[in-house]
Amino acid sequence: MADGEESISVAWQSVLDKLETDDRITPQLHGFLSLVEPKGIMAGTFYLEVPNEFTRGMIEQRSRVPLLNAIGTLDNTLAVTTFAIVVNPEIQQESLSTVGEPEPTPAPYLDVATFTVAPPAEITAPPRNGDTRLNSKYSFDNFVIGQSNRFAHAAAVAVAEAPAKAYNPLFIYGDSGLGKTHLLHAIGHYAMSLYPGIRVRYVSSEEFTNDFINSIANNRGSSFQARYRNIDILLIDDIQFLQRAVETQEAFFHTFNTLHDHNKQVVITSDLPPKHLTGFEDRMRSRFEWGLITDVQVPDLETRIAILRKKAQSEKIQVPDDILEFMASKISSNIRELEGTLIRVTAFASLNRTPVDMPLVQTVLKDLITLDDDNVIAPTDIITNTAEYFKLTVDDLYGSSRSQAVATARQIAMYLCRELTNLSLPKIGQLFGGRDHTTVMYANKKISELMKERRSIYNQVTELTSRIKQNHR
């Protein structure tokens, strides 16, 4: 080994200094490198320790060449030509203790399997469950992990286990229907299970906007500030809908700053990464980039099969593996439509008291699986077709009538908008006369259940789907 721990530390610091000016090392990679502990130099190899396999993989895969270049600039007397990374979980807690007050740079990754922390500071009031806005059906336990979402899931768990100490903010982006909202709710539930008394609030950007507008109209600005600033974790969904909403952005900007300055966690989702978000000021986008940015992608076939299997288990229904694979191979656009295929198949089997087999699946899904994934269905087409099918007007569906015929048609239209488009629940609610997202959730759940109980409802949904998709071929 080289002489003394001090010379090893000096050599490693020299390497880090070189990497500071290397454009190939992103802020996130600097975070991973900060977890490295230099252990010694032997036979031309710089031995380094990290707390987990994930950190080792990130450094070896994304930093190898810059790291070798930096090592090559060390004093010739050290004779270092390469490096080796060893995983030592025992340094996990020590590396955690070095993560202090949040800075406008990313915190390093913290291994979700071994890492423990003290509760977040200043949790002063017990939560009121109604204020969290969390959906009980979304948890880490029923989140299916695959290559398309593994990193995002690990980051979400780390944030829940160490609010404002792992990544702050955590920014998750990707197309609608791929699990971003699921992760937000799961973070909230898991954090609350770990830290009794922690204050969590989930909100969509539309709801945040409406709250802000109402606070101005009712002269209740202080109440608005208290609602969003006197919390420990803010989970905000679909931030892209704040585009060009200048005053609302200003309100969110100050909310973000207050939470971040007081060591509170912020988690944000969007359909695009920060640098591609239009209609936002640079100062806002830069704050989105302070922590960790990660994405969720379209799940691969194996993950889609696992999602269907998990859904079938949760519904307590038996579906053969070959059926699950067939459905997963035909529906690849998003998780929402994937689960919708299972609902239709099991509803048809329940109505006819028949087992789920391949002929049944092919019959049920013949119209669902023939549409090209790239052929986007507009929600207005769904609403127009639904109105025509039930011999109603579009205004009837948008309006406030509670007659059985109109209410059922409206709920079916909401269900189809949820299944066949990428719109969020609040966005669908806005389409239907500015209704709350919980109304859409209720409609989606009710129609899913009625399809299993009433053949008329099942037939109406099936015929409407066929008509809508026929028009888009």
Swiss-Prot record:
Domain I is involved in oligomerization and binding regulators, domain II is flexibile and of varying length in different bacteria, domain III forms the AAA+ region, while domain IV binds dsDNA. The lineage of its organism: Bacteria, Bacillati, Actinomycetota, Actinomycetes, Micrococcales. GO terms for biological process: DNA replication initiation; regulation of DNA replication. HAMAP family: DnaA_bact. It comes from Leifsonia xyli subsp. xyli (strain CTCB07). The keyword Nuclease does not apply. This is Chromosomal replication initiator protein DnaA. GO terms for cellular component: cytoplasm; plasma membrane. Belongs to the DnaA family.
